Design a protein with these regions (language model features):
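Short amphipathic alpha-helices in soluble, non-transmembrane regions
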Residues: 71-80
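Active-site nucleotide-donor binding segment shared across nucleotidyl transfer reactions
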Residues: 29-72
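Conserved catalytic core of two-metal-ion nucleotidyltransferases
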Residues: 82-122
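Generic structural hydrophobic/aromatic packing signal, biased to beta-strands
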Residues: 33, 40, 78, 104, ...
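Catalytic cores of NTP-dependent nucleotidyl/adenyl transfer enzymes across multiple folds
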Residues: 115-200
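Helical scaffold of the NTase/Pol beta-like nucleotidyltransferase catalytic core
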Residues: 1-43
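Short, charged/polar surface micro-motifs in flexible loops or helix N-caps
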Residues: 64-69, 111-112, 123-126
Length: 200
């Protein structure tokens, strides 16, 4: 398998991240949520600079109460205005997560599909700020070497194989994993049972 050098990896990741930022701005998703009084936090790989080849953008959206109608009103506005291909809705209001999940597929002008994970969370609930703290902790521990390792592993994950980014970070920080092959072995014997409880 052809390995990219470190500069290739960084340049490609940076290009993909710049595209993601443009998509985020172009879609106007954050202002759409702010119009219902929500506070929106970017989390995950785009926030930490670890977005590689996946076209995923993660947003955590906070309101004082969870109003299903208000949440749907934002999605209706986005669906009418944007080229959304799929919308998935999960109502977890009555669980300890106290949230509404929206998973949306959006097609950009180049016909690339982007996935927006928008988690609408009640302010003050158990998981308020948890992913934000994890994203910050991961970002703060990144060295150039660790960043390159994580990006290389992400680029080496075969197309069609879904591995949550948090599992890759866990393997690199805790297990000293340095390649996709090592990641596969590590995950077999060191499953990350609750990603929300782990900080690097």
């Amino acid at each position: 398998m052809l390995k990219m050098n470190d500069m290739d990896i960084l340049e490609l990741a940076l290009h993909n991240q710049q595209t993601a930022w443009k998509i985020l701005e172009h879609t106007g998703i954050i202002p759409a949520w702010e119009r219902i009084g929500a506070t929106v936090h970017l989390v995950g790989s785009l926030k930490s600079g670890l977005l590689a080849k996946s076209r995923d953008i993660d947003l955590h959206i906070y309101t004082d109460t969870l109003d299903i109608a208000a949440s749907f009103s934002v999605m209706q506005e986005l669906a009418e205005r944007l080229s959304l291909k799929e919308i998935h809705y999960n109502n977890l209001i009555q669980t300890e997560e106290e949230c509404i999940e929206w998973h949306v597929l959006y097609e950009d002008e180049d016909r690339n599909t982007w996935k927006f994970d928008m988690i609408h969370i009640r302010k003050g609930s158990k998981y308020d700020g948890v992913v934000e703290r994890a994203t910050a902790a991961i970002t703060n521990r990144l060295t150039p070497e660790i960043k390159n390792t994580i990006l290389q592993i992400k680029f080496d994950v075969p197309d069609g194989v879904q591995i949550p980014g948090i599992e890759i970070y866990h393997a690199v920080f805790v297990g000293g994993v340095r390649s996709y092959e090592e990641l596969e072995q590590w995950r077999e014997t060191n499953p990350l049972t609750n990603s929300l409880d782990w900080l690097p």
